[in-house]
Amino acid sequence: MTSTQLGAAGSEGLDSEEPHGLDETAFYREVRSFSFWFEAVEGYLEGRPHGYVPSTPDEELDPRRRERLITTLCNYCVGEAAALEGASGMVRLAPNHNSRIFMATQVADEARHLEVFLHRLGELGVTDPELEVRRRAHPSIVAFKHQLLELVDAGDWDAAVFALNVLLETLEFTVFRHHARTADVITSQILDGVVSDERRHLGFGENTLGHHLVGHPTDRTRLIEIKGHLDSLVMGALDGAYGDLGLHRGERPKLGRDYLQAVERLGILS
Amino acid sequence: MADFLSQYSIQRWLEMCPQGYLEDTVYGHAEGGSEPPELLDNEVLLESSIATTVQLIAGERCALAASSGLVNLAPDFASKRFLATQTLDEARHVEIFTQRLFDLGVAKEDLESTVDRYANPNLVRFAEILLEKVSDGDFIAGVVGQNIVLEGMAFTVFELLEATSRDLNPKFAQTLSGTIADERRHVGFGENRIGSLISEHPEKRGEIERMQQEMSYYMLATFADVFSDSGESVEEGRRVANDLAAERGGDPGDAAWHGADLGSASVEEIEGVLADTVLGEFRSRLGRIGIEYQSPSVPA
């Protein structure tokens, strides 16, 4: 697809090809469009079927490391399935068409993540990935998925955006980024692509809730309560991830701290 | 099933759509494409184009809501992933048809009031029947309603609109070509995936047949409403096409569609060919998945 034409709506003095040169309404229309999504993903998906460059040699993993990677990827699949089902349910809840179209792009992103992780499991010799995912899923991430889908089923848009686009995306962003540094080359490339998507999803959550809370400051208390409730599940999921990734004891608190700081940095709850 | 579903993966979708027939397009058409001045400057054609585009938006909004709802209901990951691509396809359709309304001069702040004003109530009821199935968590009925009935109707209507726009409005015709390619994929998934589920759940047949009959009734009622109001715009469109052809020193050409000469057929004939074509498609597609097509009553 070609570059979208942004010039007409751009403010004087700003680069008219940059979304940030647009007024607020035009900005949202632009960054939540199919065209914007495609241009964003094109850069890091082009030439990477299944999330990595096909010529990349697959490292020989020792059996223990391979087992750990399979368990880790199975739990990533639970998180991505939660994100996929959550995001798809949220399309109907979105308060306007721009948000609805953005959520549709997120649905496709989450489905792609699920697909590339399942494909990687297949490459690692897992013959029935769906069964393996069920077998190896940690209770905390499964419980988080149920909680998220309950919020979606209840039609609670703000809480669902918070649980999915802030908490779950931050958890995944933190764990995937950490894992990408130590993973085998193919898994690392897959994770880098996924992290690029998560960044966009986080941006949507931060922006949507930030704007909402300006007009509805009392809703902050409710979101803090939800966070308090879900944090224990997130920490449980992180605990599971520690073991799967084979982290040393000294490194473990760092990942939890990274997650909490990442949520804090969004500034939604402060 | 696994092999067939591998043809509906995100990877395949990326290669076929954004990196395939949508490459080098903006809002579904070539960059720089615009609505023809003969349409924008003609009050009758402009209003008719706005009304038509609103029906497309209403249908695609329903498809977006339904396909996203079906992701959660799908029984396996592969179907969820396909429905995720369909969700994004439908969102793209909402976006490109909404953009067309803006290209036709509808102000952004008037979008919803324009949709409310022109959306046909029978089409809205058609959509509600489908969305009720999705809300009830009925995956099989939802996919039949969405991927066979709604998509089957959209596919045929888009083909008709594409045939009538090819000469006068290449920009809109190209936009429609991309959506037709999408709809073809959606209908294919519906047929392939649901056949096996229907044979596993034969008790669902009766309910699904009633849904198809009811949706078909409201589809025919929509066609009847739209065509009964379109005589003037069809005649005006033909006059403009003839004038343009005369200016270019040729004739308007033969726009034939399913045996009907779109340049001379009466509005009633075109409506009849459209209805017969859609219902014929329903009959053969439903037959392939083991559902017996039910003739709807004819709207008054």
PLM feature spans:
Chain B
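Non-heme di-metal
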Residues: 1-300
